[in-house]
Amino acid sequence: SSAASDVYKRQDPDAVRPNALMLGYPVITSGPLAHRGSFDCLLGDNSDNQVALDAVSIERHIDAKTPPVFVWHTITDDCVPVENTLMLVDACKKAGVPVEAHLFPQGGHGLALGTAETAWQGVNGIEPCVQQWPVLANAWLRRLFA
């Protein structure tokens, strides 16, 4: 990992910055509303190290250089609390970062497109209300890059 950080330092940050972020049911915070399993996998033996946790807690790093954000989540996600998305939206708003957020009333985590093609275990994961997020994202991208 130290080699990767050195390579990044030699890059032009503006050249490697994404033009936009599109996130679905994202893990944002390492705080009390965190999805602990994500941080255990990400940080391994350092998953209890507060400095490391703060370094990967996204809401702490949103600033004016953050690219525009499109995000969606379901209110009933029982894996990653919807508050993660709300924290992201709040941080973007405070930093003046354009953000479009869609909260759908039902659906669990891992819905993908919410269609029969992406459903898992039979009908689990078919959520008609969620099926509109790709259309919304496409419209957002068209506005953003028009």
Regions from the language model: what does each represent?
Residues 26-61, 67:
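Mobile cap/lid helix-loop segments that gate and shape the active-site cleft of serine hydrolases
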